[in-house]
Structure formats: C-alpha cells, structure tokens
Amino acid sequence: MYSGICIYMFLAMLSTSSSGQQATGSHNENPVATELEQSLTEHHRHVRVPSSAGQLKPIQRLDGNVDQKANIGALLAKYLQQARKGPTGRISMMGNRVQNIDPTHRINDRDYMGWMDFGRRSAEEYEYSS
C-alpha cells in the first residue's frame, strides 16, 4: 500500500514537472524551437491556402480513397470466403481435439470441452472414483 502511494506521488511530481518545463520552454528564446514552430505554422498556412493546386488535391485524395475502398473490399471478400469455408488453423485443431475425446471421459458432461470449470465442479459436488 505504501509503495503504491509512493509510486503515485512520484508519477504526479514527474507529470507536473514535465508540464512546467513545457510551459517555460515555450517562453524561452530557443532559436531552434522558434524556427521549428515558425516553419510548422507556415506549412499549415500553405496547406490551407485555397488555390488552383489546392483544388486538385481533393481529387487526388478521392482517387486514393477509391483505391483504399477497393483494397478494403477485396480484404472483406477474402475474409468472407474464409469464414464460409469454416474454421482453420488453431481453432480447427482445437475442434478436432474436442471431437477425439473419449465418450467415457469423466469431464464429458461439462460445458467447455478440454478444460474443467472448477467452481462448477465443486458446487455440484461430483464424486469420482480415483
């Protein structure tokens, strides 16, 4: 309990100190940081400026979206084909294992084949001969 409180306090101090450094760091005249901020704001301004080239960008985006939609459609079709074929891989191996269990096995009447629900077994108080 004490260690949990110490860890919580340490994380709280760490987060407050890092947020304090970010606030003071923006007021410092760091030439690299201010140059980076200016270049980013100029980049955003250039992107948002409407022009004839800016009008062509949505058309290119639509073409990209069409390609993405086609790819997603193809993946969905593959998935549906595999789902219709039935389970494959590890799931099918587990299914085969469940079918191969001996009918006289003592956990045959459980809901989950292959593992025991211990709470249910103890609640029902089955007596097995060992």
UniProtKB/Swiss-Prot annotation:
The modification Phenylalanine amide is found at residue 118. Transmembrane segments: none annotated. GO terms for biological process: digestion. GO terms for molecular function: neuropeptide hormone activity. Expressed in brain, duodenum and small intestine. Residues 21-60, 122-130 form a propeptide. Residues 1-20 form the signal peptide. The modification Sulfotyrosine is found at residues 112, 126, 128. Keywords: Amidation, Cleavage on pair of basic residues, Hormone, Secreted, Signal, Sulfation. It is found in: Secreted. GO terms for cellular component: axon; extracellular space. The precursor is cleaved by proteases to produce a number of active cholecystokinins. This peptide hormone induces gall bladder contraction and the release of pancreatic enzymes in the gut. Its function in the brain is not clear. Turtle brain contains CCK-octapeptide (CCK8) and CCK7, whereas the gut contains intact CCK33, CCK40 and CCK58. Belongs to the gastrin/cholecystokinin family. This is Cholecystokinin. It comes from Trachemys scripta.
